[in-house]
Amino acid sequence: MLEFKEPTGHDPAGYHIYKRSRSPYERFIEGEGIPIYRGIGVYDTRDLPLGKWPRLGGRGTYLLLEGCESIKGMFVLEVPSGDALKAEKHVYDEFFVVIEGRGTTEVWREGSQKKHVFEWQPGSLFMAPINAYHRLVNATNSPALLLAANNAPPVMNLFQSQHFVWNNNYDFNERYGDSDDFYKVNTTIEAEPVRGRAAIRSNLFPDIVNANLPLDNQRAPGYRRIAPFFNGFIPDASTGGFIAEYPAGRYSKAHYHLSGAVLVCLAGKGYTLNWRTELGPRPWEAGKGDQVKIQEYKAGGLVAAAPGGGGWFHQHFNISNGPFRIINYWGGPTGHWGGIFEEGSEDEVKSGNIFGIREGGRTILYPEEDPWVRNYYRQRLAEEGAEFTMPESMFEEPAGVR
């Protein structure tokens, strides 16, 4: 116990400069003995150093991305060739995207004789249900690499009990049952009940790299998108993240929302611009372009779309000769209901992708953006031998707007 020293005179009490306290989640991952990557993004997760992971039996590295520290846990996991990881269960949700390799996953409830087994390949997305045992198996002669996302940070920070997280016998039977079709692939497209955009209910998506995506057009012309809905979660705009694709030569409108969104590149390559909203919609024109962050990535890379606690504009660009596909990688529910895209308590919410900031939305429409954005994008496309395909009509002010 530290001794408190009362100040004298008018001096303030306590340390004037002190080290930041680590959260329970940070303390947990720092004790795991594997590398921890900190930053805004990664060009390619295959390039991250991996350390031997005693708890799971493979190799891995944690990702502690800016703005996601208390919201979303992430790690890269290598399953050795011809081997399997140790089985585990925990009281938080977890999802996996396969970067490289093929294998199977076994899932079962404690005390149950029923075991679900399904196969995965590059581009597979699947869920490990809360507090269900799961084990990853690699039957090939080369290592498999997977990227995981979960909501361990808010769970560990809230309960502050490792025993509760790892040794809890509660059966979440409304979230995971014994039905044979729990991991049956579903291809039926429906509408999100809140926002009306495309969605699919499934717990296993065999190939999100090549799956057909419906036209959406909200984020950019020709933009395609679908939201995965997983079992046991209320199917609205808060759950599942989304899989999206930009055509060659096109880019998104800049927009902002709370932190937590992590975009993982599935195909093609691109870059993301990030800047604080305080810099305004035209930071380069205002002479503040040096304060804008840029993150490059290819298939297997990723970026924290809204770092710094949120309130950052971010904008995504396809510099491939073909389609540029990403997944907004969800890690499970957190303390924010309504998702990171909705704020306030109004009954009606304006779609942040459709309404510009002058209309009460959270998007910089193409006619409002800084001219530097388009000029730089044209330059990057030329360097890649790709063409600019944005319709010129996108940059015209609507009638009556000045």
Regions from the PLM with identified roles:
Residues 109-130, 277-311:
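Short acidic-glycine-tyrosine-enriched beta hairpin
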Residues 76-77, 85-89, 93-98, 117-118, ...:
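His/acidic/aromatic-lined binding-pocket segments of jelly-roll/cupin-type domains
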